[in-house]
Swiss-Prot record:
Calcium-binding protein that interacts with rotavirus cell receptors once the initial attachment by VP4 has been achieved. Rotavirus attachment and entry into the host cell probably involves multiple sequential contacts between the outer capsid proteins VP4 and VP7, and the cell receptors. Following entry into the host cell, low intracellular or intravesicular Ca(2+) concentration probably causes the calcium-stabilized VP7 trimers to dissociate from the virion. This step is probably necessary for the membrane-disrupting entry step and the release of VP4, which is locked onto the virion by VP7. N-glycosylated. The N-terminus is blocked possibly by pyroglutamic acid. Residues 165-167 are annotated as: CNP motif. Residues 237-239 are annotated as: LVD motif. This is Outer capsid glycoprotein VP7. Residues 1-50 form the signal peptide. Glycans are attached at N69. The lineage of its organism: Viruses, Riboviria, Orthornavirae, Duplornaviricota, Resentoviricetes. It comes from Rotavirus A (isolate RVA/Pig/Venezuela/A46/1985/G5P13[13]). Belongs to the rotavirus VP7 family.
């Protein structure tokens, strides 16, 4: 009996030694393979040009700022740029291939062919009804017109900021604005907005709620109207709903992938609604040239500096989506 027990113990010890030997052999073989593989990589590394996709981001809580790829000089290699211009520019240039010429010039600034899109619009009013800002970066050219300063200012306020909007049922409800960021935005072929402020008894202040002719006109036959009234006061509204849509909107902050370039004019338009603050000129720029070729040449020269004050975003803006944050 004791002989059998000794034999069992001896067999177990021999097996343990054998397994330990196998494990050490496998470990030495793996070490040999790994070290040989690393040696090959080290020897070949100087001769291989690879793409480094690493990005050093500052800890700011924001991913909106564009950063240059560490192994390429084309900062905006994978970005798209939309350039919006009045149709009169194309009419003056009178060259069917002028956009191709500009595309080649943008290529010299690091923008590959096909990454820059040119979109014309008839006038400020028509562009206000259907703004379409789909590119990573959007630059809107507005030719200064002294008679359209307010229209230009409202359009700039719309496209340079993000708005969270909800429908308004003016036939059933009264509405009030809560703070300076709260505005009523109307869009359509013809928007006439009338308001009647109400007291705590819902009686009109300086107007009669049953007589729309006594309401105050705050917008008349406009295609885009941003209405600001006294905060904290209920209002009854009258809107030309057959040709216009009105929304209750809250300004969330800047739409940082859009810039407006004013062509001509003595000063950059101020789109700040609050009269006690300094004029808002961020991403509002001005170019003073008489000829459109000179305007576009200047934009090509400064395109990368212009884009540096913007931030690449994935959200787009169009005539329907502007009502909601997209």
């Amino acid at each position: 009996m004791y002989g059998i027990e000794y034999t069992t113990v001896l067999t177990f010890l021999i097996s343990l030694v054998f397994v330990n030997y196998i494990l050490k052999s496998v470990t030495r073989a793996m070490d040999f393979i790994i070290y040989r593989f690393l040696l090959v990589i080290i020897l070949l590394a100087p001769f291989i040009k690879t793409q480094n996709y690493g990005i050093n981001l500052p800890i700011t809580g924001s991913m909106d700022t564009p950063y240059m790829n560490s192994t390429t000089s084309e900062t905006f290699l994978t970005s798209t740029l939309c350039l919006y211009y009045p149709n009169e520019a194309a009419t003056e240039i009178a060259d069917t291939k002028w956009t191709e010429t500009l595309s080649q010039l943008f290529l010299t600034k690091g923008w590959p062919t096909g990454s820059v899109y040119f979109k014309g619009y008839a006038d400020i009013a028509s562009f206000s009804v259907e703004p379409q800002l789909y590119c990573d970066y959007n630059i809107v050219l507005m030719k200064y017109d002294g008679n359209l300063q307010l229209d230009m200012s409202e359009l700039a306020d719309l496209i340079l900021n993000e708005w969270l909007c909800n429908p308004m049922d003016i036939t059933l409800y009264y509405y009030q604005q809560t703070d300076e960021a709260n505005k009523w935005i109307s869009m359509g072929t013809s928007c006439t907005i009338k308001v009647c402020p109400l007291n705590t008894q819902t009686l009109g202040i300086g107007c009669s709620t049953t007589d729309i002719n006594s309401f105050e006109i705050v917008a008349n036959a406009e295609k885009l109207a941003i209405t600001d009234v006294v905060d904290g006061v209920n209002h009854k509204l009258d809107v030309t709903t057959n040709t216009c849509t009105i929304r209750n909107c809250k300004k969330l902050g800047p739409r940082e992938n859009v810039a407006v370039i004013q062509v001509g004019g003595p000063n950059i338009l101020d789109i700040t609604a609050d009269p006690t603050t300094a004029p808002q000129t961020e991403r509002m720029m001005r170019i003073n040239w008489k000829r459109w070729w000179q305007v576009f040449y200047t934009i090509v020269d400064y395109v990368n500096q212009i884009v540096q004050v913007m931030s690449k975003r994935s959200r787009s803006l169009n005539s329907a989506a502007f009502y909601y944050r997209v």
